[in-house]
């Protein structure tokens, strides 16, 4: 017995998520252009998508960070410390570049609403006071109220505590993390429909001005990533190896960044990076640890995304930011970026944590996340390419520096 073919279902299963998002974006634009009244009604789909993101984000941050810390292995004898330092310096430098670019070229977003009961911080002292109170919040209340700083604090604390637990307990945490990540992936699969509703309603209400705002935001994001890839990272590598870094930089971008751009997953690109390290003749005991570690914590692209989108929301809402607070944002964005690995849309879902520094409500922060999904077609690909290629770049730089030091001894 033969069953009739279902070309629509076949097309959906064969088309990538990026392709589906592009279709949803174009369909939303067309609907808003020709049937604005209908476009306003389908905005409900976008609201459902944003609500789903709001529901999953707190649990995601809590479980992911706790499981990651609990399952960290101790006692590995490798030259990992210099590479770890490069990862942290690179991520923080990327956040600083994003802060400078956001001040030099401020972006404005078209948000559905500007809540009137906002209480933006007056300066660094007030921010630190609010930060401390958020850290010591009740964990249940932190999850319910989406207090991401409190969630992060409890996740780190419990993760450290569970490092001394039995293997069974740590495996359970790892499986729990995988389960939550699967739920996130299911939510992200509905991104094309959510983007369709968001784009249709946004452009029906705001017209071409919203598109201009997104274009400017995308230019700032990609400009920061290109600057980090071709200026900041080569400078860091030069200080480490004391020779022309660009042959190595271009090799990593070509061999690792190209595949990462299309897979949009640092975890999926780990085999590619391991093979590239082998071809470069690097120390196997080092890169076998540093590459998976880099896929977890080396997140310069994510730091840029979190910083630029957060400051875009701050600029849109008219919140004044002083220099110390901007520096604190760079630190927070770097820490947030380390928790964005291996998760679909991870860097976008951590934006509310950074937004909370400025008293921005979760409702507004998740609208910013939705904007991020609209531009994610290019943003996420470029972010992953920067993150993954830098894993090999910094590993190669550290290995070469160690070899030079050993030969000089």
From Swiss-Prot:
Membrane topology (UniProt): Multi-pass membrane protein
Tagged with keyword Transmembrane helix: yes
NCBIfam families: PRK13628.1
Functional description taken from the UniProt entry: Involved in the import of serine and threonine into the cell, with the concomitant import of sodium (symport system).
Lineage, broadest ranks: Bacteria, Pseudomonadati, Pseudomonadota, Gammaproteobacteria, Pseudomonadales
The keyword Membrane appears for this protein: yes
Assigned keywords, A-Z: Amino-acid transport, Cell inner membrane, Cell membrane, Membrane, Symport, Transmembrane, Transmembrane helix, Transport
GO BP: serine transport; threonine transport
Name the UniProt record assigns to this protein: Serine/threonine transporter SstT
GO cellular component, one term: plasma membrane
Any one GO MF annotation of this record: neutral L-amino acid:sodium symporter activity
Subcellular location: Cell inner membrane
Family: Belongs to the dicarboxylate/amino acid:cation symporter (DAACS) (TC 2.A.23) family.
Catalysed reactions listed for this entry: L-serine(in) + Na(+)(in) = L-serine(out) + Na(+)(out); L-threonine(in) + Na(+)(in) = L-threonine(out) + Na(+)(out)
Chain ranges passing through the membrane: 17-37, 49-69, 83-103, 142-162, 180-200, 218-238, 301-321, 331-351, 357-377
């Amino acid at each position: 017995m033969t069953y009739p073919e279902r070309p629509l279902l076949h097309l959906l299963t064969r088309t990538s998520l990026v392709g589906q998002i592009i279709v949803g974006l174009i369909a939303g634009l067309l609907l808003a252009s020709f049937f604005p009244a209908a476009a306003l009604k389908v905005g409900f789909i976008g609201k459902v998508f944003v609500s789903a993101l709001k529901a999953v984000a707190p649990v995601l941050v809590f479980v992911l960070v706790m499981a990651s810390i609990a399952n960290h292995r101790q006692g590995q004898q490798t030259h990992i410390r210099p590479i770890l330092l490069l990862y942290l310096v690179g991520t923080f430098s990327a956040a600083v570049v994003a802060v400078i670019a956001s001040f030099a070229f401020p972006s404005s977003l078209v948000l559905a609403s500007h809540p009137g009961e906002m209480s933006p911080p007056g300066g660094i002292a007030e921010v630190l006071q609010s930060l401390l109170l958020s850290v010591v919040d009740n964990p249940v209340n932190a999850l319910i109220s989406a207090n991401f700083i409190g969630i992060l604090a409890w996740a780190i604390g419990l993760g450290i505590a569970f490092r001394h637990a039995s293997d069974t307990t740590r495996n359970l945490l790892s499986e729990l993390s995988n389960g939550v990540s699967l739920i996130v992936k299911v939510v992200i699969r509905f991104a094309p429909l959510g983007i369709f509703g968001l784009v249709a309603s946004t452009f029906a209400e705001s017209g071409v001005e919203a598109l201009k705002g997104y274009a400017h935001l995308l230019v700032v994001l990609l400009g920061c990533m290109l600057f980090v890839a071709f200026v900041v990272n080569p400078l860091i590598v030069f200080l480490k190896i004391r020779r022309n870094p660009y042959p190595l930089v271009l090799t990593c971008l070509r061999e690792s960044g190209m595949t990462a751009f299309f897979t949009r997953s640092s975890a999926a690109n780990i085999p590619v990076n391991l093979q590239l390290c082998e071809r470069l003749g690097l120390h196997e005991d080092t890169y076998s640890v540093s590459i998976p570690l880099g896929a977890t914590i080396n997140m310069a692209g994510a730091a840029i995304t979190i910083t630029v989108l957060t400051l875009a929301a701050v600029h849109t809402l008219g919140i004044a930011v002083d220099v110390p607070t901007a520096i604190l944002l760079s630190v927070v964005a770097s820490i947030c970026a380390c928790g964005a690995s291996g998760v679909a849309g991870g860097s976008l879902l951590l934006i509310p944590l950074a937004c909370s520094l400025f008293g921005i409500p979760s409702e507004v922060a998740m609208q910013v996340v939705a904007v991020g999904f609209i531009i994610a077609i290019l943003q996420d690909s470029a972010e992953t390419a920067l993150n993954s290629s830098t894993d090999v770049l910094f590993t190669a730089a550290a290995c070469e520096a160690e070899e030079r030091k050993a030969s000089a001894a």
